[in-house]
Curated annotation (Swiss-Prot):
Its EC number is 6.1.1.16. HAMAP family: Cys_tRNA_synth. It comes from Streptococcus equi subsp. zooepidemicus (strain MGCS10565). Pfam families: CysS_C, DALR_2, tRNA-synt_1e. CDD domains: CysRS_core. Its main location: cytoplasm. A motif ('HIGH' region) lies at residues 31-41. It catalyses: tRNA(Cys) + L-cysteine + ATP = L-cysteinyl-tRNA(Cys) + AMP + diphosphate. It is found in: Cytoplasm. Gene3D superfamilies: Cysteine-tRNA ligase, C-terminal anti-codon recognition domain, HUPs. The gene is cysS. This is Cysteine--tRNA ligase. ATP binds at residue 272.
Length: 448
C-alpha cells in the first residue's frame, strides 16, 4: 500500500514518491520564539510529529527539520519590554518550547536551525537573487520582484492580478520604497538601537520568508520532499518561500505541501482579544501531556479541531481505556489472521493522508478484541507500535509481589468457598486501583 498525501499545491491526493528511496526530507515551520507556544502551535508540532512517526513505522528514514525564528520584530519588541536582549528572550522561549513539546511526546527534530546561525548564508542567498534580477535594493532595504516570479501565489490558488486588486491604494512608507506593492522584504535596514547584522545594503536583519528558504535548502537541498506548517502560512509565508527559492535554484522547492487546520476554543477562533488564548505551558499545569496529544489526534490534521473541557475529558477517559488494555496479562497465542487484519486496517487508515481519526478507530476495535482475551506477545508488540505512531508510550507497570499474593489468596479463598474473604480481598485490591475480571479463562486484572 502506498502512502497518499493531500498536496496543497495541486489540491489533490497524491501518492508519495520520495526523492531518495525510503528517505523522507521534511521541513516544518517552527515558532517565532517571543512567547510560550499556544495550542495551535502545538497542533502543528504534534501533527507533523505523527506524520514523521508513521513514515518511520512504514520503514522510512526521516530527516526532520523544524526551525526557530529567533530574529523578528515581535522578538525585538518583547525583549525590550522584558529588559532582555533578543537572544536572551529567544533562548528562554526555545527552552520552554522544548519542555512543552517533550511533554506532548514530540520527538526531537533531526535539527532545529536558528536564524541567527545562518546570517552569512541568508546574505549570500539575497545577493544571488539580486544578481539574477529577482531582487533590488531600495534605501537600505532589499525587496523581491513578485512580477518576475513564475506562477506566483499558485500555492494559495491566487493570481498576481487578484493580489494587485487587493493592494491598490496602499500609500504607507514601505510601499513607497517598492517597485510594486506586492514586493516583499528580503532584508530590512535596522532602526537606531535595534539588533542588526552587517550586509552590502545596510546594517539590518532578514525578512521572515527568506529565513526558512535558506535553512531548508542549506540542510535538505534545493528540492525537499515535504514542506509543512499551519494553514495560516499558506499565504504569504510559504508562497514567498516558493517564489524566492525557485528563483534562485530554478528547481521545484518542495514536492509536497502539507498544512494543518486551526484549533478553535469552545467553537470560537482562538485570539487574545476574545480572552480564549491558551498556551501549552499553562494547559500542562492541569492537563496531562499525553491526554492533550491524544485529543489533537482525534481529528484529521487538515480539519479544524474544537478544544473544549469535554473533549479533553473524553480524551482522558479513552487513554485510560487503552492503558488498561495494555496492562492485561498475555496469553500464549491469538488469532494471527485477525491480528494481520487489524494491522492492515491501521495502515490503510494512515496511508490515506495520515487519517489519525480512522487510525484511532482501528486501535479501539483492536483493544476490544484484546480485552476479550486475545493478548499474545505478538498482539502486544503490534498494539504498542501503533500507539507509538500517535506518540502514546505508557511506562511499563508490572503487578508487584503484594498484589500477586493477594490475587493468589483470593483464588484460594474462592476454591475453599470462603466468599467473604474473597470479596474482602477484591475490595482491598479495588482500593489500590486494581480491578479484577473473572473470566472463563481465569482471573484478569486492570488498573482502574
Amino acid at each position: 500500500m502506498m502512502i497518499k498525501i493531500y498536496d496543497t499545491m495541486t489540491r489533490s491526493l497524491r501518492e508519495f514518491v520520495p526523492i531518495t528511496d525510503k528517505v523522507v526530507n521534511m521541513y516544518v515551520c517552527g515558532p517565532t520564539v517571543y512567547n510560550y507556544i499556544h495550542i495551535g502551535n502545538a497542533r502543528s508540532a504534534v501533527a507533523f510529529d505523527t506524520v514523521r512517526r508513521y513514515f518511520e513505522y512504514a520503514g522510512y528514514t526521516v530527516n526532520y527539520i523544524s526551525n526557530f525564528t529567533d530574529v523578528d520584530d515581535k522578538i525585538i519588541k518583547a525583549a525590550k519590554e522584558a529588559g532582555l536582549s533578543p537572544k536572551q528572550l529567544a533562548d528562554q522561549f526555545i527552552a520552554a518550547f522544548m519542555e512543552d513539546t517533550k511533554a506532548l511526546g514530540v520527538k526531537p527534530a533531526t535539527k532545529n536551525p536558528r536564524v541567527m546561525d545562518y546570517m552569512d548564508e541568508i546574505i549570500a542567498f539575497i545577493a544571488a537573487l539580486i544578481k539574477k534580477g529577482y531582487a533590488y535594493e531600495s534605501a537600505g532595504d532589499v525587496y523581491f520582484r513578485v512580477a518576475k516570479a513564475s506562477n506566483y501565489a499558485r500555492l494559495a490558488n491566487k493570481t498576481i492580478a487578484d493580489l494587485e486588486a487587493g493592494a491598490s491604494g496602499r500609500t504607507d512608507t514601505e510601499t513607497a520604497l517598492k517597485e510594486n506593492p506586492l514586493d516583499f522584504a528580503l532584508w530590512k535596514s535596522a532602526k537606531p538601537g535595534e539588533v542588526s547584522w552587517t550586509s552590502p545594503w545596510s546594517a539590518g536583519r532578514p525578512g521572515w520568508h527568506i529565513e526558512c528558504s535558506v535553512m531548508a535548502t542549506e540542510l535538505l537541498g534545493d528540492t525537499i520532499d515535504i514542506h509543512g506548517g499551519g494553514a495560516d502560512l499558506e499565504f504569504p509565508h510559504h508562497t514567498n518561500e516558493i517564489a524566492q527559492s525557485e528563483a534562485k535554484t530554478s528547481k521545484t522547492f518542495a514536492n509536497y505541501w502539507m498544512h494543518n487546520g486551526f484549533v478553535n476554543v469552545d467553537n470560537e477562533k482562538m485570539s487574545k482579544s476574545l480572552g480564549n488564548f491558551v498556551t501549552v505551558h499553562d494547559l500542562l499545569k492541569t492537563v496531562d501531556g499525553q491526554t492533550l496529544r491524544f485529543f489533537l489526534a482525534t481529528q484529521h490534521y487538515r480539519k479544524p479541531i474544537n478544544f473544549t473541557e469535554k473533549a479533553i475529558h473524553d480524551a482522558e477517559v479513552n487513554l485510560k481505556y487503552l492503558k488498561n488494555t495494555l496492562q492485561q496479562p498475555t496469553v500464549a497465542t491469538a488469532d494471527s489472521s485477525q491480528l494481520a487484519a487489524f494491522v492492515t486496517a491501521f495502515k490503510a487508515a494512515m496511508n490515506d493522508d495520515f487519517n489519525t481519526a480512522n487510525g484511532i478507530t482501528v486501535l479501539f476495535d483492536m483493544a476490544k478484541w484484546i480485552n476479550s482475551g486475545a493478548y499474545s506477545e505478538a498482539v502486544k508488540s503490534a498494539f504498542e507500535e501503533m500507539l507509538a505512531v500517535f506518540g502514546i508510550v505508557f511506562e511499563a507497570e508490572s503487578l508487584d509481589t503484594e498484589i500477586e499474593q493477594l490475587i493468589a489468596e483470593r483464588q484460594e479463598a474462592r476454591a475453599n468457598r470462603d466468599f467473604a474473604k474473597a470479596d474482602a480481598i477484591r475490595d482491598q485490591l479495588a482500593a489500590q486501583g486494581i480491578k479484577l475480571l473473572d473470566t472463563k479463562d481465569g482471573v484478569r486484572w486492570i488498573r482502574d
